[in-house]
């Protein structure tokens, strides 16, 4: 369906004029609006992923909650955007859900491709810290992201040093009333996320917990350094069983994983992934220790 030119009416009865299409992913299409500060994300209501996003925005991503958390943790920036408005639009045959969200800049994937598919070690460690801060906030609200990757990390339009982790269509609630979800397989959750970066728990059908997000971030940092994961080529075939088996092979062989993936493997990345692999499914990570390890990688490359 052609959306450009349509007028959408949100939950507060405000009108949004849909502009040109500027992005399309697994969880909806993104269009400009008549307000340059915002974009509108649209997908068929039946798909359900935008409803998941909408629920996450309204339950968790409240500006006051984020600001209070930043103060209490002495962290300057949490890379999560908020939702301006939402609503439904009904065409002749299909009903659509839409979200009005902050407009951001280029995604990290585009930045990496523009830099010959490789970022400096210091930059990768800094980005790792930013994403670690962001998922710590999510985890402490009881949610995992489930799809960390460069195309879901977006730069601020003005301050290019600010990064945002976007696309909340695969967020999972792993804590409820202070209790962790049980370690039970759900076939409907098998292989959720982007196959190359999907955590091993997700391959097996378990809800992504804290260690799953940290595992995915480790895979991403290898790729951002210009590395090729042992299962990168296999993931292009969409054979999830082979990808899962390849990842499992390296769980207790972190050094081999890094030597296979990278010409030069930073010691700090070895420490990071080793620490992730030592976590249990239910365990709360020591985020400060993970930050310390990555910051060591930043400082040794400080100019």
Curated annotation (Swiss-Prot):
Its cofactor is Mg(2+). Autophosphorylated. This is B1 kinase. Induction: Expressed in the early phase of the viral replicative cycle. Interacts with host JIP1; this interaction increases the amount of MAPK bound to JIP1 and subsequently increases the activity of transcription factors, such as JUN, that respond to these complexes. Interacts with protein OPG198; this interaction inhibits the repressive activity of OPG198 pseudokinase on viral replication factory formation. InterPro entries: CK1_Ser-Thr_kinase, Kinase-like_dom_sf, Prot_kinase_dom, Ser/Thr_kinase_AS. GO terms for cellular component: host cell cytoplasm; virion component. PANTHER family: CASEIN KINASE-RELATED. Its EC number is 2.7.11.1. The keyword Acyltransferase does not apply. It is found in: Virion; Host cytoplasm. Its main location: virion. Belongs to the protein kinase superfamily. Ser/Thr protein kinase family. Poxviruses subfamily. Keywords: ATP-binding, Early protein, Host cytoplasm, Kinase, Magnesium, Nucleotide-binding, Phosphoprotein, Serine/threonine-protein kinase, Transferase, Viral release from host cell, Virion. One of its GO terms (molecular function) is ATP binding. Essential serine/threonine-protein kinase that plays different role in the viral life cycle. Phosphorylates the host small ribosomal protein RACK1 thereby customizing the ribosomes to a state optimal for viral mRNAs (which contain poly-A leaders) but not for host mRNAs. Facilitates viral DNA replication by inhibiting host BANF1, a cellular host defense responsive to foreign DNA. Phosphorylates host BANF1 on serine and threonine residues; this leads to BANF1 relocalization to the cytoplasm, loss of dimerization and impaired DNA binding activity. It catalyses: L-seryl-[protein] + ATP = O-phospho-L-seryl-[protein] + ADP + H(+); L-threonyl-[protein] + ATP = O-phospho-L-threonyl-[protein] + ADP + H(+).
């Amino acid at each position: 369906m052609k959306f450009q030119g349509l007028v959408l009416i949100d939950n507060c009865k405000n009108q949004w004029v849909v502009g040109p299409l500027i992005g399309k992913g697994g969880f909806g299409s993104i269009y400009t609006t008549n307000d340059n500060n915002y974009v509108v994300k649209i997908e068929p209501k039946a798909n359900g992923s935008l409803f998941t996003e909408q629920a996450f925005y309204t339950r968790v991503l409240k500006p006051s909650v984020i600001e209070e958390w930043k103060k209490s943790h002495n962290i300057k920036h949490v890379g999560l955007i908020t939702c301006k408005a939402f609503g439904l639009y009904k065409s002749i045959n299909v009903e659509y859900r839409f979200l009005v969200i902050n407009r951001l800049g280029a995604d990290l994937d585009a930045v990496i491709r523009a830099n010959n598919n490789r970022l400096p070690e210091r930059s990768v460690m800094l980005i790792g810290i930013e994403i670690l801060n962001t998922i710590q906030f999510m985890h402490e609200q009881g949610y995992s992201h489930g799809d960390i990757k460069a195309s879901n990390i977006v730069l601020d339009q003005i301050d290019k040093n600010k990064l945002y982790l976007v696309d909340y269509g695969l967020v999972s609630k792993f804590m409820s009333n202070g209790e962790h979800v049980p370690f039970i397989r759900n076939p409907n959750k098998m292989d959720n996320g982007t196959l190359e970066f999907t955590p091993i728990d997700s391959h097996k059908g378990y809800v992504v917990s804290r260690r799953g997000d940290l595992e995915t971030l480790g895979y991403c940092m290898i790729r951002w350094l210009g590395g090729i994961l042992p299962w990168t080529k296999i993931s292009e075939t969409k054979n999830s069983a082979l990808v899962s088996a390849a990842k499992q092979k390296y769980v207790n062989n972190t050094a081999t994983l890094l030597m296979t993936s990278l010409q030069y493997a930073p010691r700090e990345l070895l420490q990071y992934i080793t620490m992730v692999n030592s976590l249990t499914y239910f365990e709360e990570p020591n985020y400060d220790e993970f930050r310390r390890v990555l910051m060591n990688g930043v400082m040794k490359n400080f100019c």
